[in-house]
Amino acid sequence: MLRVSAVFILLLPLFFTPVSTYGGTLSIVSQSRWVEVGRVLDGDTFVGNMGEHIRLLGINTPEIAHEASPAQPMGDEATQALTKLIAGKSVRLDFDKQRKDDYGRTLAQLYLRDGTWVNGEMVRLGMAHVYTFTPNLRWAAPLTLLEAGARQRQTGIWSTERFSMLDADDVASGNLGQFRVVQGRVGEIARDGFSFRMGHLKVSIPRKYRRYFGHSRVAHKGDRVVIHGVVRASSSGLYIALHSPSDVEKIAP
């Protein structure tokens, strides 16, 4: 069981209360617009009534069934949760640096007219995990806090074997291609500070993302950290690449 820091205790009420309080502080109204929800496709995507495909930015939900691929655990429940939140309603779209993804979908944070922050609420409910990518980092910090609360409560996806936190020593070839949350202690660190070991698992920051991490080391030897990323393999073994500062969290010893 992870030890809970004093900061986490102070923020605990946020994890049990619908996240409406973030609406006014994180949005830039001049860059916002309203759309009517037409059809919810899955837990993180919907179609507006004018045919626009909109992807909830900064989060990812389990996959629903697609042709030969079965649904992931909680995939249908995540779709139902988003449907309950936004179906038949007007939602405000707030934007970060990039407004479109490679599939042409609009990337946005969603807010209801009552101020509810939909992306944050999906994370708080345990129906989504944080999935940030540079340069879209404006909402990364509060999303990460909400995910930590959901993990601590083991609610939603965090109650399933597929999404539960792994210890670094337990990451195996069976996890290849999976987005996982992994905890462990930092071991050997590369001289440049952009890669380190957690047991047999290598953690690295690809060159093109390093400028987003600043000049200080991401972690120090002996630190206990939680990392987020896709498990991959190279000639030197299993590794996870970090793409944004929110992909690594320091936790109490």
Language model regions located:
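Small beta-barrel nucleic-acid-binding modules, primarily SNase/OB-fold domains
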Residues: 2-253
